[in-house]
Design a protein with these regions (language model features):
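ATP-dependent carboxylate/acyl-activation modules
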Residues: 1-198, 202-316, 326, 337, ...
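Rossmann-like NAD(P)-binding element
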Residues: 110, 459-463
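Catalytic core of bacterial c-di-GMP phosphodiesterases, primarily the EAL and HD-GYP domains
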Residues: 321
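Amphipathic alpha-helical interaction surfaces in cytosolic regulatory modules
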Residues: 324-345
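Intrinsic, low-complexity polybasic segments
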Residues: 391-394
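A cross-taxon signal for low-complexity, glycine/charged-rich
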Residues: 396-399
Length: 463
């Protein structure tokens, strides 16, 4: 769950992290009154949306009089702010944050994230903070400092000094930075955060450290023990389809493709999406109906899928371990009849009562295309999305070796999913390939050398 800047700064203040004085406003008049109450002759008006890149998109304005505050707020409120992180539709601005201006001598980047490879909370810092930190990380990665914290030992003084020295701090700033770093670390742990970011952390002209911006993301699965933070959720900043999915216990993420996926299990869902990508199309969504999938949940899943008008075909891929395939088949038939599905549907069912499930689908008389395995399912749904008729599946066997998807793979882009174009280890990729039905060489005794694969859905990756 994401928090607005003003909400994150309220939490910062509770942990003694220095921030500029500021107030929230929902109208131009409130913004002007807030600036008057703050005093001074320099203010910053910031649009409150759950996205970065606001400064370059006109969502942050520096003004020097009350009329300027009012005009800046009027230009933001009620509008949709489009940044590099929002997509073309942007996010609605219902609040602005009016903050006292600060004298900036230097800008620093500082954040805490969980490094899943080392299983450690990790500080990431750079002396080149500010709006261009992504460019700095891409072009000059040597300017990024990373320090992992052992979960048993906790944050140590030498690690704080290591970060401070790397950021070029000196004198009393080192002790000040150590206090700030410890406060951020406690916040991260106690609030069940998945990200705490300060960009920029400024050094003022007086030499003080001040958090000029604040971003906090909270782990969704821990919200049950963070009721105060859960109450801060802003539904206007969330995808309405994803929000509706969560109300039905469905894990749904919108993507840019045109083939919808309905799968039980996150790993199988990722493998399914990979094969769609390998066969030349892109998935329209990530949808995990979970291990306890029911007929009702399948119906709701179809409704969510069909709310996306870009979808040209649907692939249902269910492995019945806990869930019974015959119940899922009944749910699919009911959903297709109830919702009125007008686009091709390909179904692959394996596991508990799979034979009975196939009979249910065949007896329904509906235009549902069965698939014998995952590769066959991906091939058929891609052909149907293109408007061509798939070849009927053979009665048995796994198909010719020439039909293996590896021959069609674009070697410039390894498959996988990370919602914000992150990094997935090669070991994880191997697991996905295995789940997707690829053969492993039984003679290979040594593991392959680990490497990193950059993964972007909807964009090509460099080799």
């Amino acid at each position: 769950m994401n928090l607005h800047e003003y909400q994150a700064k309220q939490i910062f203040a509770q942990y003694g992290i220095p921030i500029p004085a500021g107030r929230v406003a929902t109208s131009p008049e409130e913004a002007s009154d807030a600036a008057r109450a703050l005093g001074g002759s320099l203010w910053v008006v910031k649009a409150q949306v759950h996205a970065g890149g606001r400064g370059k998109a006109g969502g942050v304005k520096l003004v020097q009089d009350l009329d300027g505050v009012r005009n800046a707020a009027a230009a933001m409120l009620g509008k949709r702010l489009v940044t590099r992180q929002t997509g073309v539709e942007g996010l609605p601005t219902t609040k602005v944050y009016v903050e006292s201006g600060s004298s900036i001598a230097r800008e620093i980047y500082l954040s805490l994230v969980l490094n899943r490879e080392t299983s450690r909370i990790t500080f990431i810092a750079s002396a080149a903070g500010g709006m261009d930190i992504e460019e700095v990380a891409a072009k000059t990665p040597e300017r990024i400092i990373s320090v992992g914290v052992h979960p048993a030992a906790g944050l140590q003084g030498f690690q704080c000094r290591q970060l401070a020295f790397g950021l070029g701090l000196a004198g009393g700033q080192i002790d000040e930075f150590a206090r700030l770093a410890n406060a951020l670390y406690r916040l991260y742990l106690e609030r069940d955060a998945s990200l705490v970011e300060v960009n920029p952390l400024i050094v003022t002209s007086e030499g003080r450290l001040v958090a000029l911006d604040a971003k906090i993301n909270i782990e969704e699965n821990a919200l049950f023990r963070q009721p105060e933070i859960a109450a801060l959720r802003d539904p206007s900043q969330e995808d309405p389809v994803e929000r509706e999915a969560s109300e039905h216990d469905l894990n749904y993420v919108s993507l840019d493709g045109d083939i919808a996926c309905m799968v039980n299990g996150a790993g199988l869902a990722m493998a399914t999406m990979d094969l769609i990508k390998l066969h030349g199309r892109a998935p329209a969504n990530f949808l995990d109906v979970g291990g306890g999938a029911t007929s009702e949940r399948v119906t709701e899943a179809f409704k969510l899928i069909l709310s996306n008008r870009k979808v040209r075909a649907i692939l249902v891929n269910i492995f019945g371990g806990i869930v019974r395939c015959d119940l899922i088949a009944e749910g699919i038939v009911n959903a297709v009849q109830q919702v009125g599905v007008k686009i091709p549907v390909v179904v692959r069912l394996e596991g508990t009562n799979a034979d009975a499930a196939r009979k249910t689908l065949a007896a329904s008389g509906l235009a549902i295309t069965p698939a014998r395995d995952l590769t066959d399912a991906a091939t058929k749904v891609v052909m149907l999305a293109r408007g061509t008729s798939p070849r009927p599946s053979p009665a048995s066997g796994r198909g010719r070796r020439d039909e293996h998807p590896r021959r069609q793979q674009d070697q410039g882009c390894l498959p996988g999913l990370h919602r914000q174009a992150g990094h997935v280890s090669f070991g994880a990729m191997s697991g996905l390939r295995h789940a997707a039905g690829r053969r492993r060489d039984a003679r290979a005794r040594r593991p392959e050398t680990p490497r990193i694969a950059c993964v972007r859905y909807g964009a090509r990756c460099g080799g």
